[in-house]
C-alpha cells in the first residue's frame, strides 16, 4: 500500500490558509473522508491549536491527535521544500497510528510567491493569495502562483474596499496559469469551498471514495 495522499497549502501570511482548512475539512468529513492536518509556523503552534479546538475538540470531526503543529524555527519554505524531513517524519508517524486516513493536509508557514512544496512531501499543491494584496498579485507570477496545482484567490468581499478589480485578477490568472485551474473563494462566507473540496477529491484523491487507497 502506498502512502496516504498529501495536499500542501502555501501562501503569504494572512492569506487565509488556516481558515481554508477549517472550511474544507468539514466538507470532506461530511463525505466520509478521514483527514489529518499538519500546520507549520516559524515559532508558534497557534494555528494548529485553533484548528484542533475548532475541528476536533468542539466539533468532533477528527481525533485531536490528527492536528499537529510544527514550529520550524526557520524560513517557512525550508521545512516544506529544501528539507521536509521533519514534516515527513511526523506524517509517517501519524499514518502508522491511523491506518484509516484518507488524506493529510500540510499547511506551510506564511511565505512569499516563490513558495513550493517538495514532491517528497506533497502530492498536490494549493497556493492561496488574497484580494487585499491588490489586483496586481496574480500577474506578479512566481513559482507558487505559476506552478501550483490549484491557485485560490481569497477575500473577494474586500475588492471594493482596496480598489481591486476581480476581472483584472481573473484575466491575469488565466494568462499566467494557462490551462492550470484557479478559483475565487471567500472563506468567511464559504464561497467556493465546496468546489475546493471537490477539486481535492477529484485531483488529489483521484476520485477514490473514503477508505480506498489511491492508485
From Swiss-Prot:
Matches recorded under CDD domains: UreG (cd05540)
GO molecular function: GTP binding; GTPase activity; nickel cation binding
Compartments reported by the entry: Cytoplasm
Protein name: Urease accessory protein UreG
Subunit annotation: Homodimer. UreD, UreF and UreG form a complex that acts as a GTP-hydrolysis-dependent molecular chaperone, activating the urease apoprotein by helping to assemble the nickel containing metallocenter of UreC. The UreE protein probably delivers the nickel.
Pfam families, per the entry: cobW (PF02492)
Protein role: Facilitates the functional incorporation of the urease nickel metallocenter. This process requires GTP hydrolysis, probably effectuated by UreG.
GO biological process, one term: urea catabolic process
Sites where the protein binds GTP: 11-18
Upper lineage: Archaea, Nitrososphaerota, Candidatus Cenarchaeales, Candidatus Cenarchaeaceae, Candidatus Cenarchaeum
Protein family: Belongs to the SIMIBI class G3E GTPase family. UreG subfamily.
HAMAP family linked to this entry: UreG
Cellular component, GO annotation: cytoplasm
Species, as recorded: Cenarchaeum symbiosum (strain A)
Key words, A-Z: Chaperone, Cytoplasm, GTP-binding, Nickel insertion, Nucleotide-binding
Keyword Protein biosynthesis: no
